A protein has these predicted regions:
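Electropositive, gly/pro-rich neighborhoods at or near active sites that engage anionic ligands
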Residues: 1-90
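Redox- and metal-dependent alpha/beta enzyme cores, enriched for Fe-S-associated oxidoreductases
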Residues: 75-121, 125, 131-133
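Short, aromatic/basic amphipathic alpha-helical patches
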Residues: 109-113, 155-162
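A short, aliphatic-rich alpha-helical micro-motif
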Residues: 137-138
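Glycine-rich, N-terminal phosphate-binding loop of Rossmann-like dinucleotide-binding domains
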Residues: 147
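Short glycine-rich, flexible loops that bind phosphorylated cofactors or substrates
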Residues: 151-153
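Ser/Thr/Gly-rich flexible loops in soluble cytosolic domains mediating phosphotransfer, phosphorylation
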Residues: 163-188
Length: 188
């Protein structure tokens, strides 16, 4: 039993990362995987009132992607004021995401747009330094690098081209929940 009898809120992002890995990778027994997914979601919903806005939106997206029935409606209008306030206070208008896992960048972008509709998000997956990557590194207000899904040459290139007054943050995982986690950690 991977999760145990209960889930603590400090475990949620790690659990979401594992859930995301089971979606990205093949499985020899689809029934066991579906059973695992259902167990994970039911455990997460037990602590729903303690989850952050981005965690709730990630769970909502998982349920939609995996076509789970809405046995219990997740608060779609999760309180996102901390994140919005952070972006407004720092006058953040542009966000860049670098990851070789294109689906993760895209899904993270969709969830961020749901929380902050007016933000401009650009994703990049170049494996080496390019002119578009250089421009993005110089101009984005915040740059998120998914280090588990990045090429060292591109990561170094981004860091070398980032102005000192611009924020660069590093997501430990390769999935979209890791990208959201690192942004959220900056906001609260």
């Amino acid at each position: 039993d991977l999760i145990g009898d209960g889930v603590g809120t400090s475990q949620v992002y790690g659990i979401l990362d594992i859930l995301e890995e089971t979606i990205m990778n093949s499985c020899p027994d689809q029934n066991i995987r579906k059973s695992f997914w259902n167990e994970v979601i039911s455990k997460l919903l037990e602590v729903e009132q303690h989850l952050s806005p981005s965690q709730l939106l990630v769970i909502k997206k998982f349920r939609k992607t995996l076509e789970w029935p809405d046995q219990k409606e997740i608060k779609a209008e999760a309180e996102t004021s901390d994140i919005k306030d952070f972006f407004e206070k720092l006058k953040i208008k542009t966000l860049a995401i670098y990851s070789l896992t294109e689906s993760a960048s895209k899904q993270a972008s969709e969830i961020i747009k749901e929380m902050i509709p007016n933000i401009k998000i650009t994703v990049n997956k170049d494996k080496v330094g390019t002119n578009p990557l250089k421009s993005l590194a110089k101009n984005a207000d915040i740059f998120v690098i998914a280090t588990s899904s990045a090429k060292h040459a591109a990561t170094t290139f981004i860091q070398n081209n980032r102005p000192k007054d611009k924020m660069t943050i590093f997501a430990a995982g390769r999935g979209y929940s890791s990208i959201l986690r690192v942004i959220e950690e900056q906001c609260v």
